[in-house]
A protein has these predicted regions:
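N-terminal pre-domain/capping segments
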Residues: 1-68, 72-91
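Active-site beta-loop-alpha junctions enriched in small/polar residues
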Residues: 7-11, 34-36, 69-71, 109-111, ...
């Protein structure tokens, strides 16, 4: 049986995410630990952290995963944005430790006029700065991107290069987003193509570093650079591709977390049911 879940809201209080995940039938889940669209945040109180930890223990589900806010850009040439991004990463690593959440997923950013090589270096430097004083027990997961203009991390080799520049590599893992990969040109539509893509991942990064799958179908065609998630099996990757991912022997034990729409077509419960159907 695969471990499957979705991204859930922390509205009201962070511990409510656990009950929302449980209500949806999740084995695992992802949250933002704070408002993802701003730089400011409310510190976690000891009480709120304790209630969250207790709720997790009682639920029997996990791991929980935190996703970084949207604004940080670790490849930015603008020093104010760059310094805020590093600070934000440091804060999120600490918040994960307080909540006893082992995984923090982050996008890497956009390099702008710096170019790819300098952008990768900036990303690695930012991570090195943030990890210097980061508490133990939290892994930072670098997420592949969809190939938007000037983005860092759409090429698996770029992620491997960045990891090679990080000093404390034992703290680094990877989150693979299927929608992003397909949009960046990695074909996932058949059993053989899934095998080829993850062979490339193993060669350029190492499958031993892969810790979470963002299992999303996609609206965009192969190589489109379009980051538009679709319901499981209803997008360009399709049922055969999703089934092949779920049955890949090196992936099957990983947490599969969806960031799919909730609309009249299907809700989170429906997408979880679809994944479990395809995983049989």
């Amino acid at each position: 049986m695969v471990s499957v879940g979705v991204h859930v809201s922390i509205a009201g209080s962070i511990d409510r995410a656990v009950s929302r995940a449980t209500e949806r039938g999740c084995d695992t889940f992802q949250i933002f630990s704070r408002n993802p669209r701003g730089w400011s945040y409310k510190p976690l109180t000891d009480d709120s952290a304790s209630v969250f930890i207790k709720a997790m223990q009682e639920s029997g589900i996990g791991p929980a995963v935190v996703h970084m806010p949207y604004l940080p850009n670790f490849a930015s040439e603008k020093e104010n944005i760059y310094s805020q991004s590093v600070e934000s990463l440091s804060v999120e690593l600490s918040r994960c430790a307080t909540l006893q959440i082992p995984f923090l997923v982050t996008h890497l950013g956009h390099h702008g006029p710096l170019g790819k090589e300098d952008g990768r270096r900036r990303v690695a430097d930012a991570i090195n700065f943030a990890l210097e004083d980061a508490p133990e027990g939290v892994f930072l997961l670098l997420e592949n991107t969809a190939g938007e203009k000037n983005s860092v991390g759409s090429d698996l080799a770029d992620i491997g290069d960045i990891i090679g520049k990080i000093q404390d590599q034992q703290r680094i893992k990877v989150c693979f987003d299927t929608c992003h990969a397909f949009a960046a040109g990695y074909d996932l539509r058949t059993h053989d193509l899934v095998g080829e893509t993850f062979d490339r991942f193993d060669s350029e990064i190492g499958l031993d570093l892969l810790s979470v799958i963002h299992l999303n179908d996609t609206k965009g065609i192969l190589g489109s650079g379009l980051d538009r998630h679709e319901h499981i099996g209803l997008g360009q990757i399709g049922e055969e591709g999703i089934r092949s991912i779920l049955h890949h022997p090196r992936l099957r034990s990983l947490p599969f977390i969806m960031e799919t729409p909730e609309d009249s077509t299907r809700d989170d419960i429906g997408n979880i049911a679809k994944v479990r159907e395809l995983a049989v």
